[in-house]
Amino acid sequence: MLGKRKRVVLTIKDKLDIIKKLEEGNSFKKLSVLYGIGESTVRDIKKNKERIINYANSSDPTSGVSKRKSMKSSTYEELDRVMIEWFNQQKTDGIPVSGTICAKQARFFFDALGMEGDFNASSGWLTRFKQRHGIPKAAGKGTKLKGDETAASEFCGNFQEFVERENLLPEQIYGADQTGLFWKCLPTRTLAFDTDQSTCEYRTSRERIIIMCCANATGSHKLNLCVVGKAKRPRAFKGTDLSNLPVTYFSQKSAWIEPSVLKQWFEKCFVPQVQKHLKSKGLREKAVLLLDFPAAHPAEELLSSDDGRIIVKYLPPNVTSLIQPMSQGVLTTVKRYYRAGLIQKYMDEGNDPKTFWKNLTVLDAIYEASRAWNQIRSNTITRAWKKLFPGNEENPSVSIDEGAILAANLATVLQNTEDCEHVNIENIEQWFDSRSSGSNCQVLADIVGAADRAKVTEQKPSRKTRKAELNPEKHISHKAALEWTENLLDYLEQQDDMLLSDKLVLRRLRTIIRRKQRIQNKSHL
């Protein structure tokens, strides 16, 4: 007589493996024998495939699915979703999170969401919350979530062994990371901005987008910037073919990239672009992508190419500031280029601050952010990988700080602008480095108003010139030229065979026309 089969309790990771094997064509019987479970259990796993995957997506990818066995959800699912998003954001920013802080924040969200019920943010609730999302016990005890040097060192060693074992070259190793960009954040203090405090607080949730930078360790392959906004199709996109944008655009409501968006980007953008690049280099179409820890990311098992040759590896918790390549100055430099571009765009157009701010659209921001990412040099990227690959830099003795050079160049331009002579590099660095968590945007001091006055003084047309313009043989107004340029830009956005450089030229012409129109309006006052 056969003995009773021992009861086997599968982890979430085991169930994900079974789902993957089923998709590969393995039979129910084969898997039941392999895992020591009944065929009916395998069928149940297939039936609950979507629920299992969704649960795995909301768990800590480094430990949540490997240890967790049940999928019991929270009584207050909306609160649970908001809390894990908040927790991830605090962890990314290196902000201390204790059990008391978690409890208070949960209570705040419960009330803010207008939820009903007898909710008590007790220690029991906190324990269950951490278990549901695979959050390590050490997290939430009040220690600052900063770089864990021991974990970073251990990961570096293991990763280098993995690279050698898989025979991967730096060309085949990629890194990606995301950051929030307050795209309407302008320098504020004195002059025009100081007269109305409401204009100083330019940063609102509607004016924030997420950008994700991705490149390989050599810096030779930078994927198009990934941009995530709240609106599926912003008004500024009217008439624009999204496939013609210089970035890959997604929409969602959350503050950080959701699992579904990341999975879609990985499958539709990352994998095919990497395969194409490696093929052009005559290399095996095999690669690995390093991603940060956030628990909202899909499990590693869910992110791989169909042939399993392009995979994802997650960094351990709390090592982003130490070894995440894109966090070693790359994202910061992109933001600096973006902000410097805003100032240059403002000075080129010659509008007053409020008009410039009002006219600035998310489409403008996307082009400016794309330009900023394109300006990042390959040696800046290779230098960012030096902790994972100490010998990866071509010329390690030559270190170029793009951010410092950018600040110095902008300071030189402004110091040669009337009434901005006192602006120094420290002022610019302060604005460049202002964090999204601050109460207001940092300042450059008197830049915008002085720039207006300098341009009006320099370019204000004479009375004779204005008189000659009244009766020209054929006069085209700035307004008409601007309308035609806008229409032509809309046309180009709808075409799938236009070069980005062509569109950038027209956008530059539009900036010049706007500036001329502004100067003319001022001259008639």
From Swiss-Prot:
Entry annotated with the keyword DNA-binding: yes
Gene Ontology molecular functions: DNA binding
Protein's name in the database: Tigger transposable element-derived protein 2
Main location: nucleus
Family statement: Belongs to the tigger transposable element derived protein family.
Ranges where the DDE-1 domain occurs: 168-385
InterPro entries xref list: CenT-Element_Derived, DDE_SF_endonuclease_dom, Homeodomain-like_sf, HTH_CenpB_DNA-bd_dom, HTH_Psq, WH-like_DNA-bd_sf
